[in-house]
């Protein structure tokens, strides 16, 4: 079973050579991006790592995303990547895991790790096998070309969340901890953008509250801020999973908005790259 790309040519270039060049531009961007390319990754991850990574079009969020992938490359190469993305389409199960086969991008095919899928399904009360939730969803797909560019070969577990409640976040964190017993060199990505379509000043204020909750590694505070301050962050459930995993350190690598790229500060979207270890 092959999951074909649905936002190639929209969120990122559909031609391999153009996509590689776009990713290089994101890394080499000195204004918002890190200003450097990742070098060869010669060692494997020794312990699990969490990553908060944006999922907008590469021209907007790609330079911010590059910070996270550059930092993971410095730590080591994952053999398994669990990617938790929000369900923007309303299709499929509340917690849908793509069970088998490959995900395709212009850079090639990425295998789904069926052993890891089985562990998550058996350890979670809410996760179900589901392809429908993934068919038109972009939040997981846009992470793959960056991963392919930096690491080459790896396997994935794609997890799509329509239900992003605290209960589900706690349940999935338990399931991921069970997974970590078998896969130590695993990268867990929470794919999310931050506040949406308000002016720059308002978005910065709201985004910094999200950053505060992440820095404190406090998922309850995150949910509190989302409700109290009306923050339209789309992938908060995946971030809550990371915050519930018991990582001992958090580093905020980069925050920016679409307004920093386009110059339009009336309606912006916030982007964050952060690493947990």
Curated annotation (Swiss-Prot):
InterPro entries referenced in this protein's UniProt entry, alphabetically: MEMO1_fam
Pfam families linked to this entry: Memo
Tree of life domain: Bacteria
Gene3D superfamilies found in the cross-reference section: LigB-like
Family statement: Belongs to the MEMO1 family.
Name of the molecule in the record: MEMO1 family protein CTN_0605
Organism of derivation: Thermotoga neapolitana (strain ATCC 49049 / DSM 4359 / NBRC 107923 / NS-E)
Taxonomic placement: Bacteria, Thermotogati, Thermotogota, Thermotogae, Thermotogales
